[in-house]
Amino acid sequence: MKENEKIIMEKGIHTDFKENMTYGEYLQLDSLLSSQKRLSDHHDEMLFIVIHQASELWMKLILHELYAAIESIKQDKLQPAFKMLARVSKIQSQIIQSWDILATLTPSEYIEFRDSLGQASGFQSYQYRMIEYALGYKTPHALKIYEKDPELHARLHTALHAPSLYDVAIQALVKEGFPIHKDVLNRDITQPYEEDATVEAAWLEVYADVKKYWNLYQLAEKLIDIEDWLQQWRFRHMKTVERIIGHKMGTGGSSGVSYLKRVLDQRFFPELWNVRTKL
């Protein structure tokens, strides 16, 4: 037996899987790897599909971690939440790199299969919408996009009505004794969050006395990390779109780059940014 064959067939490596689960079976690779179905015969459409499917898988993990972190904070278990939120940031950094790969798609290549997309657009990504909802950017009007699928629409409806990460972070301030205005605590959580002076004052006190409020300070910084990464993702999205289609209208009907530039101004945790100026 050749030396390289000896390495591959090292003693103890399992080779008989007639009655045992394989790696491919555990990951359901047959199903996963058969889901890349091009609607054109253009070579580069495969790149487009794989990039977006991979991003959706990462977003599934982001939601898994965000929901667990929200429940953990509700139960006053901040330390486990820190680990989950730190993982979200790492996932975000990974997704951002995918834009570098998609940017290898030139305008001439994309135009060859763009019409195959019809009105399908990343704007319709329900997982991205759920991430926005989980972070507190609620857009009730967007639910109409998902009416085609009643089960999916119900999931989005549930996500819209659930407390966001920032909602439970503000509740953590209340539990620590900070006086948060009742309008914030009793607000309609299906609507976008609007910044509040009492919330800002609370975070300002947290940042002014880090030792006393260490856990709240750590929570605040984890939130800033997530929003920072999300804004970087949005910027790379906008520049990649501009690089590939310029200022054409998006397939989903948006104004394309102009819309993506406006989105950059959306904030999830406004008071946490404001305190940096006031410290």
From Swiss-Prot:
Its EC number is 1.13.11.11. InterPro entries: Trp/Indoleamine_2_3_dOase-like, Trp_2-3-dOase_bac, Trp_2_3_dOase. Keywords: Dioxygenase, Heme, Iron, Metal-binding, Oxidoreductase, Tryptophan catabolism. It comes from Bacillus cereus (strain ATCC 10987 / NRS 248). NCBIfam families: trp_2_3_diox. This is Tryptophan 2,3-dioxygenase. GO terms for molecular function: heme binding; metal ion binding; tryptophan 2,3-dioxygenase activity. Belongs to the tryptophan 2,3-dioxygenase family. GO terms for biological process: L-tryptophan catabolic process to acetyl-CoA; L-tryptophan catabolic process to kynurenine. Substrate binds at residues 48-52, 110, 114, 251. Its cofactor is heme. Heme binds at residue 237. It catalyses: L-tryptophan + O2 = N-formyl-L-kynurenine. Pfam families: Trp_dioxygenase. Binds 1 heme group per subunit. Homotetramer. Pathway: Amino-acid degradation; L-tryptophan degradation via kynurenine pathway; L-kynurenine from L-tryptophan: step 1/2. The lineage of its organism: Bacteria, Bacillati, Bacillota, Bacilli, Bacillales. The gene is kynA. Heme-dependent dioxygenase that catalyzes the oxidative cleavage of the L-tryptophan (L-Trp) pyrrole ring and converts L-tryptophan to N-formyl-L-kynurenine. Catalyzes the oxidative cleavage of the indole moiety. It comes from the Bacteria.
